[in-house]
């Protein structure tokens, strides 16, 4: 259940009973200090100011009308009008027992399910995926998982770069290599070197460059031979991306790919409609939409070119066509874009033009969720030692290799299990190190920090889960099916039970704000509270009464299930042991 929402509804009802207008919020939040209870409602002060009454007296009248019998052991007023709510241990135990028996652990949101399009990853198929693609791929995938978990219909869209002038050069190079007897899969086995070879060929061979430019025209006009070569290139490049997605445990599949080329037939119509509405006007031969809404400090409108002087289209045109498709064909209520912060103005422009042209209904939520950059120790964007782009595949391989060296310390593991654990730890460490940082900030990439089993890291959370699994193995019990009465007596038990129950609140917040680090911080706090509980409250010691032992096992099982579920929503796998 969502405790915060449950309590907020009760406090809001009491506020209404004492004559406070409904537009005043209870301002209910988790208390920052144990002495202030478990939750705190601060709405009386804002209401009292507007109503010109004493806030403490108003808070008292709210408390007098507040029905929390059987829920709170104590409700008290502190300071100028804070309402501190101390929850009953027995009530917490009942709620945890009920939530643990459900498949999802967390009550799904009561809001009506929406159709949500999530645009993420979207690599350029001309090149191999590099570290710059990591953040969009894993942050977007985390939100897609969470929104689905909350009951929304999620439509993933991998808006790959599969069109443009560079493809003339690449198709010409592929044709050359195929004429030498190579198969497409072999010729393109290393996309990076293939691209460099094609570029060098283009720069040094005038005849090749002429052919490449001709192939762009033939591609755009639908020449079947050129289209076949383009399809071969796309197929092999997408296969490279899918291998990365599989290794990253990302849910994107071939069915989610809808590249730039998918909108080619709609681009002329987009420009025509913008012209018909008087939004697009000719400027130096190009078609431009001038947005006064995004004017600069001098008052000059922001120009959005939708068609070049030579008749060609731009990213803005394609993105407008994609928006029309997503709100029309896909019937999206909400569209989330996970694109880095450098594209913020572009996304603002596209959203503004789409609204003005009525390409999207007014109720559709258009959201650009930007993110910062992965930095090296030198404070510059993460590169190889030679200053080149780091291939994502090589980064992930190194993560698994480094993790295997850590896992090798456990001599009880056979080779296959050790390799599986190393993969989960290495990939999980990379993903968690990224997801646990505030999305909008840059962060410094550090191997030692991310692979540590101490602190707010992926390996630490995976270890916390295996620690609980080992308790059940030692007790010769099945964690998933174990059942017993849950009783809460110790402070550490209450803190752990309360934190476990707050999972639903956290997931709902992440779904709304698209900030995965909030879930990461929650899981770290939960793991830390479990370690504190484990030290203070013995479970399997011989002098522990059976009912206490079983109760603590039930509590531990709830924590393990919550950890596994939370990590799964982050796209991180758990293991039986480490």
Swiss-Prot record:
InterPro entries listed in its UniProt record: aa-tRNA-synth_I_CS, Arg-tRNA-ligase, Arg-tRNA-synth_N, Arg-tRNA-synth_N_sf, ArgRS_core, DALR_anticod-bd, Rossmann-like_a/b/a_fold, tRNAsynth_Ia_anticodon-bd
Which GO molecular function terms does the record list?
arginine-tRNA ligase activity; ATP binding
The UniProt entry's GO CC annotations, sorted and at most eight, read: cytoplasm
Sequence motif: 'HIGH' region, positions = 123-133
Biological process GO annotation list?
arginyl-tRNA aminoacylation
Q: What reaction gets catalysed by this protein? A: tRNA(Arg) + L-arginine + ATP = L-arginyl-tRNA(Arg) + AMP + diphosphate
Q: What class of enzyme is it?
A: ligase
Q: Which family is this sequence assigned to?
A: Belongs to the class-I aminoacyl-tRNA synthetase family.
Task: Spell out the subunit comment.
Answer: Monomer.
Q: What is this protein called?
A: Arginine--tRNA ligase
Record organism: Teredinibacter turnerae (strain ATCC 39867 / T7901)
Q: What's the gene?
A: argS
């Amino acid at each position: 259940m969502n405790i915060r929402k449950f309590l907020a509804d009760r406090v809001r009802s009491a506020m209404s009973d004492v004559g406070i207008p409904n537009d005043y919020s209870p301002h209910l939040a988790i208390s920052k200090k144990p002495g202030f209870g478990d939750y705190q409602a601060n709405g009386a002060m804002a209401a009292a100011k507007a109503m010109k009454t004493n806030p403490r007296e108003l808070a008292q009248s709210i408390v007098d009308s507040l029905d929390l019998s059987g829920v709170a052991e104590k409700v008290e007023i502190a300071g100028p009008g804070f309402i501190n709510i101390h929850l009953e241990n027995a009530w917490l135990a009942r709620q945890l027992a009920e939530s643990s028996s459900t498949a999802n652990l967390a009550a799904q949101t009561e809001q009506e399910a929406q159709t949500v399009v999530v645009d993420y990853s979207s690599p350029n198929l001309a090149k191999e995926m590099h570290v710059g693609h990591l953040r969009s791929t894993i942050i977007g995938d985390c939100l897609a998982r969470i929104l689905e978990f909350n009951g929304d219909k999620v439509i993933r869209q991998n808006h790959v770069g599969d069109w443009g002038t560079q493809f003339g050069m690449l198709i010409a190079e592929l044709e050359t290599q195929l004429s030498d007897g190579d198969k497409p899969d072999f010729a393109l086995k290393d996309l990076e070197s293939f691209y460099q070879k094609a570029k060098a060929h283009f720069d040094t061979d005038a005849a090749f460059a002429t052919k490449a430019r001709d192939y762009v025209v033939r591609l755009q006009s639908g020449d079947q031979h050129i289209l076949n070569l383009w399809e071969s290139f796309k197929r092999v490049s997408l296969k490279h991306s899918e291998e990365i997605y599989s290794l990253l445990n990302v849910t994107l599949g071939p069915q989610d790919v809808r590249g730039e080329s998918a909108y080619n037939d709609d681009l002329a119509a987009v420009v025509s409609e913008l012209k018909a509405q008087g939004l697009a006007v000719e400027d130096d031969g190009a078609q431009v939409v001038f947005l006064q809404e995004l004017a600069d400090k001098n008052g000059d409108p922001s120009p959005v070119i939708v068609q070049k002087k030579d008749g060609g289209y731009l990213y803005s045109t394609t993105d407008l066509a994609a928006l029309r498709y997503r709100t029309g064909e896909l019937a999206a209520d909400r569209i989330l874009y996970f694109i880095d912060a450098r594209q913020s103005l572009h996304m603002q422009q596209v959203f503004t033009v789409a609204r003005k042209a009525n390409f999207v209904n007014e109720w559709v939520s258009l959201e650009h969720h930007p993110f910062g950059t992965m930095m090296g120790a030198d404070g510059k964007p993460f590169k190889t030692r030679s200053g080149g782009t780091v291939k994502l595949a090589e980064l992930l391989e190194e993560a698994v290799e480094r993790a295997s060296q850590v896992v090798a310390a456990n001599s009880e593991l056979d080779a296959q299990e050790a390799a599986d654990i190393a993969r989960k730890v290495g990939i999980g460490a990379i993903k968690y190190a990224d997801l646990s940082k505030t999305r909008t900030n840059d962060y410094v990439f550090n191997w030692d920090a991310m692979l540590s089993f101490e602190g707010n890291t992926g390996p630490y959370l995976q270890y916390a889960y295996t620690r609980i699994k080992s308790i059940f193995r030692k007790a010769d019990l099945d964690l998933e099916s174990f059942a017993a009465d849950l009783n809460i007596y110790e402070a550490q038990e209450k803190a752990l039970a309360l934190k476990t129950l707050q999972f639903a609140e956290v997931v709902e917040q992440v779904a709304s704000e698209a900030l995965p680090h909030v879930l990461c911080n929650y899981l770290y706090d939960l793991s830390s509270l479990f370690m504190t509980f484990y030290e203070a409250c013995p479970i399997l010691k011989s002098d522990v009464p059976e009912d206490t032992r079983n109760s603590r096992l039930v509590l531990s099982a709830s924590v393990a299930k919550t950890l596994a579920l939370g990590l799964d929503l982050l796209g991180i796998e758990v293991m039986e042991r480490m």
